[in-house]
Amino acid sequence: MAKATVKTDKQEEKQRQRELQRRADLIRQRTASRRRRFRLGGGAAAVLLLVGAVAVAVRGYGSTTPTSAVAASLGAPTGATPPTPTGQFHKVGSVLRQGGKAEFVFFGALYCPHCAAERWAIVKSLSQFGRFAHMSSTTNGQGVPTFDLTHATYQSKYLSFVARDMEDQNGNALQALSADQRLLFSQYDPSGGIPLVAVGGYAMSGSPILPDEISGRPFNAVQSALKHNAGDTFVQDINAEANELTALICHADGMQPQAACGRPVIRHLVASVR
């Protein structure tokens, strides 16, 4: 009886892996198609300051499950680090600033699986510098649980946050970019890939967090795993990316606050940022 159970478990695992691979193939095809929509051309003009205030108030596609305590429930920061000091980020220019504060930019779309995965790290990192409100949890069209920031606000003494989801779950136009934002997008990411994350003079197109790692899991399960620093690969990946984002923010804002920027892992990462 035990042997039969083992065999069944193996069969189920193989079936699960095949399904994940099928989803990954579909995601790659859909993302490749979507990216063509965001090719906005090159641009050599100087980067202009983005429109926005201390809080980013965005509106758009409705989502589910109001989660006012979500940001504070992703667990304490850990010592996880990316494979390289600056992760997948590359130097793009001077530090973006808004109202005298370092500016953090996220351009994505609600259908985008890598955007969904990256939001976990963004929320965990930025919660160390300020406070989110009016967030929701939702599930991406490919089954990836994530945060919906389209109604969110963010307040911080140290950081300005700009988040724009350009299309909804069905690929319909959602949040249009301003002229300055389109210029920044074309300069930092000429290929038009999403998500685009920019902070501290560095930018990244894509995400090192594999969406398949959390696809099909309930939002609360991912949240709980992060809160308890479980041994799952996605927990390590999200925590490492959160630390990378934190280091870039600390580099840009003069290493404040000490609670976020004074940790040894962050000081080590900041030392590698030019």
Kindly give the residue locations of the regions a language model identified.
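An acidic-aromatic
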Residues: 122-126
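Conserved redox-active cysteine motifs that mediate thiol-disulfide chemistry
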Residues: 109-120
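Non-globular targeting/processing and membrane-anchoring segments
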Residues: 1-103, 117, 127, 131-274
